[in-house]
Amino acid sequence: MRTHDDTWDIKTSVGATAVMVAAARAVETDRPDPLIRDPYARLLVTNAGAGAIWEAMLDPTLVAKAAAIDAETAAIVAYLRSYQAVRTNFFDTYFASAVAAGIRQVVILASGLDSRAYRLDWPAGTIVYEIDQPKVLSYKSTTLAENGVTPSAGRREVPADLRQDWPAALRDAGFDPTARTAWLAEGLLMYLPAEAQDRLFTQVGAVSVAGSRIAAETAPVHGEERRAEMRARFKKVADVLGIEQTIDVQELVYHDQDRASVADWLTDHGWRARSQRAPDEMRRVGRWVEGVPMADDPTAFAEFVTAERL
């Protein structure tokens, strides 16, 4: 059960979900036609010790094994893998556009096992600030350093809780509020209550000068019936793989029905925003998965929002 001040490392709670995401990036990297390349994702997964359920995501036959349950379960597993690749590619492109426009200050909110500070080709002078729980940041930087991996930008860790006074910690790490910034909230908002989401964007806006940019993945809305169905399906997948499901992601997510539309909120608070539905972006890059349930429900899938400070 989540609390307002809960904490975690890379093996527990919200921290462990970063391992799942990294596993999807590793699988994508191994494809003959990858949308993105993350040469460090597999390393970060296999050293995390977060449990067999997450390492099983590296299995190239996972979709076929899920098909033994039923076609819809296989489609869901394939969708989750494809979605992570498309999401990563979308935000990689966002950062490429930001630095092409001259932005040299980047802040990744709840960075988890995000390896962009290491794998992207950043212009000289770029500083990437990563905000997350202290133990999550420490695991990533230590693991990569021990394997000879160095950042491709000036990387600065900001150990802070995004539900607390993280802007002060960011400034203490060297953040310049007078410089244009490219912000990213990827894989984050669903783990925040609705009011915390609004507060986060208010805090971002307070330290963003005109010309700053932000990109965010929205939190899709699922009813209790759908959540129960998803739990049952993932338990079946775990049973087929013969492994214990140690974390219920649905218990970590806040399913607030009154959560504000990110694009609308930003538009109302001094940003010029646009959004792209995840299914539309997946189709655009040729990675939509047929057979995914609720494909026609506009609230069931995330949106990718980008905005510029006015």
From Swiss-Prot:
Function noted in UniProt: Exhibits S-adenosyl-L-methionine-dependent methyltransferase activity.
Residues given in the record as S-adenosyl-L-methionine binding sites: 132, 161-162
Gene Ontology CC entries for this record: cytosol; plasma membrane
Key word Cytoplasm present: no
Name the record gives this protein: Putative S-adenosyl-L-methionine-dependent methyltransferase Rv0146
GO biological process, one term: symbiont-mediated perturbation of host innate immune response
Family to which the UniProt record says this protein belongs: Belongs to the UPF0677 family.
The EC number(s) this enzyme carries: 2.1.1.-
Gene3D superfamilies hit by this protein: Vaccinia Virus protein VP39
Pfam families, A to Z: LCM
GO molecular function: methyltransferase activity
NCBIfam families referenced in this protein's UniProt entry, alphabetically: mthyl_TIGR00027
EC class (word): transferase
